[in-house]
Amino acid sequence: MSQDFSREKRLLTPRHFKAVFDSPTGKVPGKNLLILARENGLDHPRLGLVIGKKSVKLAVQRNRLKRLMRDSFRLNQQLLAGLDIVIVARKGLGEIENPELHQHFGKLWKRLARSRPTPAVTANSAGVDSQDA
């Protein structure tokens, strides 16, 4: 998997965001943020960012946070294949320094990857014919 952040790896429409908000399969709370995730059925992850003016006042800080989040996602996307991910910023996130944020995101991605539900074994995947069962 390449480490790019192309258009196909972004949540672009309100419908995509709504799907993650309405039924997340994984939640990882962090320091001043929340990560929501949902299986997307694709072979690559997609990222959406929600950083409101109420949470982070200055545009410079919002843009810095978005840049750091995208970069961290890009470097860790092999852990996150098949997920739609939304990061919701909360108050105080803009005051955290860059190295601390990078370290924090590294831990959060690993926690999210560990919290993924393991695929359930179905009758068909176990080699049992459903008509005989």
Swiss-Prot record:
Keyword field contains Nuclease: yes
Pfam families: Ribonuclease_P
Primary enzyme class: hydrolase
Reactions catalysed according to its record: Endonucleolytic cleavage of RNA, removing 5'-extranucleotides from tRNA precursor
Entry GO CC: ribonuclease P complex
One Gene Ontology MF term: ribonuclease P activity
Keywords: Endonuclease, Hydrolase, Nuclease, RNA-binding, tRNA processing
GO BP: any one term: tRNA 5'-leader removal
EC identifiers of the protein: 3.1.26.5
Function noted in UniProt: RNaseP catalyzes the removal of the 5'-leader sequence from pre-tRNA to produce the mature 5'-terminus. It can also cleave other RNA substrates such as 4.5S RNA. The protein component plays an auxiliary but essential role in vivo by binding to the 5'-leader sequence and broadening the substrate specificity of the ribozyme.
Stated family: Belongs to the RnpA family.
Known partners and oligomeric status: Consists of a catalytic RNA component (M1 or rnpB) and a protein subunit.
HAMAP family: RNase_P
Protein's name in the database: Ribonuclease P protein component
Gene for this chain: rnpA
